[in-house]
Amino acid sequence: MTRKIFTNTRERWRQQNVNSAFAKLRKLIPTHPPDKKLSKNETLRLAMRYINFLVKVLGEQSLQQTGVAAQGNILGLFPQGPHLPGLEDRTLLENYQVPSPGPSHHIP
């Protein structure tokens, strides 16, 4: 019984952390109207589109400022803006895998 309580408590804590992270992400994504409540799915999809937009803007600014494309990746995660695939064809993150800690690991 104690193990079940511990497992339930850990799952509740994990779900609260996930929900908190989504709430923070929702605040960073511009929406119209501004107070629109987004589902988790909508939040992730809009976040990917917004990241794509920002990377393209940074890539274009880099091209305008230097006359050539900036070397390397932005934050080491994404290719340069002008070379990103369109969201219609595939998502930005499909080729990028982040290692996941096991269920017993805690990331501060």
From Swiss-Prot:
Region annotation (Disordered) ranges: 89-108
Annotated SUPFAM superfamilies: HLH, helix-loop-helix DNA-binding domain
Gene Ontology cellular component annotations, sorted alphabetically: chromatin
Keywords assigned: Chromosomal rearrangement, DNA-binding, Proto-oncogene, Transcription, Transcription regulation
BP GO terms, sorted: midbrain development; multicellular organism growth; post-embryonic development; regulation of transcription by RNA polymerase II; thalamus development
Domain bHLH: start-end pairs: 2-54
PANTHER family registered for this protein in UniProt: T-CELL ACUTE LYMPHOCYTIC LEUKEMIA PROTEIN 2, T-CELL ACUTE LYMPHOCYTIC LEUKEMIA/STEM CELL LEUKEMIA-RELATED
Disease: A chromosomal aberration involving TAL2 may be a cause of some T-cell acute lymphoblastic leukemia (T-ALL). Translocation t(7;9)(q34;q32) with TCRB.
Record's protein name: T-cell acute lymphocytic leukemia protein 2
